[in-house]
Amino acid sequence: MQSQVLLYYKYVAISDPEKVRNEQRALCESLNLKGRIIVAKEGINGTIEGTVADTEKYITAMEEGQYFKNISYKKSEGNGHAFPKLSVRVRPEIVTAKKLDIDPTKVTGKYISAEQLHDWFVSKKEFYIVDMRNDYEYISGYFEGFIPSGIQNFYDLEQVLPRLQHLKDKTVVTVCTGGVRCEKASGFLVVNGFNDVYQLKDGIQTYMEQYPNEHFKGKLYVFDSRLTVGFNTDDPKHEVVGRCDYCQKPSDTYVNCEYNFCHRHHIACEDCLDAETGFAFCNKECKENWVKSDSRKKKYPQQNFI
């Protein structure tokens, strides 16, 4: 049966997150759904996978509940194993901003739809896209002319301000995967004196679905085993914009350095994986440390890698 992945969020005041967590876990288990759901007093943020029928039942159940009506669900084709298990947790925030203390229900940027943004590109309107994703996410796909956040974690958002000061009186559009981070990121810019701040409604995924290979190049990074999602990738207009860290050839295949104390997330082509092990290592030192490590000895006790 065809699998489907749902990406969704909602900022809404939840009085008893633990109760909602338990309800979410029970609902997902009853529908054989796997994925990650975060519940907090500020709302819910989730990505789940199941059959098309079961994910649609999940949406129906959410609409009938107390808190989660009128959520915009971003749907994409699953592979049946996007997630190894179900994780439903209560956390202080659904997107960790820590000390920034931004409440999107009180302050956030104006919404711009995928259609409006596409029109702006076509009409060559003056505007500036700021990609609020982590730095490793946009190396596989990005909007034309975008300004990178340059951050490794969303809670480092303050580091974005110095590179954007010249845009305080310009039209700025914040973008992210599904929209949840831009709710806070756009609000953060507003409270810091930016005068014309927008956020891409429903995120990059929705734009790519409606306008594949038009002003967004490459593939979209996602936080599950698929790692990247593309739309109409057989179209001659589709570009592979990622580059192998080692040889700089076009690639959009993400790997982790195999060494336990590194695990750097990066892009590598198949030709540049270690010939002896088939794994990715950042450098000779990482491989040597991995060979000596206890984890390697437990996993491959009979092999002596040089």
Residue ranges, per PLM feature:
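Rhodanese-like catalytic fold shared by cysteine-dependent sulfurtransferases
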Residues: Q2-K110, N134-T171, V180-I306
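Internal catalytic-core helix/loop-beta-alpha segment
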Residues: V107-V122
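Structural scaffold elements adjacent to functional motifs in cytosolic proteins
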Residues: I129-D131
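Substrate-contacting helices/loops that form the catalytic groove of nucleic-acid
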Residues: T177
